[in-house]
């Protein structure tokens, strides 16, 4: 759970003073400190909407309450340049968060990461940060396509998200399919630099890699929480499909009507969704 911070370059009705933003954030952190069900995280909207005093203040709160950070990173070329304009003396977008101490006390989660520089990638890898691919959102805002294959090959952690503000649905399974589709487009336009990812690659990033943000979730391995969906794949009795083909079918054409049961930490959820 997070509380978004922004004290500049934002609509007036969303802009806080630096002092109020830090005060309300600390109040929220203190309220949930020690909770077994709620994990807190800091959420500066992104560097262009946060002053240096705000970013530095959030870094101090991260140290005090031992929490991580969730924000956007190099979502667009404009964002990357604007961040450096507002933070002179910094060499990359990621360095803004690193120097503030926001990447030292918990998971650091960065949405989009479409135009990472070598310095951005070095910092992300150093801190074991998660770059979150949000396929639908990047299309909707005409941002670009994450270089997932390259980042994966360089050992960066890649999770997957829906970006409920920039996206248009909360089903992560559809993002799995969309990630494959976008990788095909990237290969088409950059055949010498990019290659298509497989459905199993995308599924791994959406499940085990994403789940590792929270601990041992996202896998059916021993010792992991049993979080699962029971899916009616509507398989034709005369059609033999592999497990991978069944997964692919659901990700591309399935929806919530195919989900017959949901388990969280081994418990069957009884309520309807």
Tell me the role of every PLM-derived stretch.
Residues 59-68, 102-106, 123-132, 153-158:
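Glycine-enriched alpha-helix->loop->beta-strand junction motifs that scaffold or abut catalytic
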Residues 75-107, 112-126, 139-150, 168-174:
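Catalytic core of soluble alpha/beta enzymes
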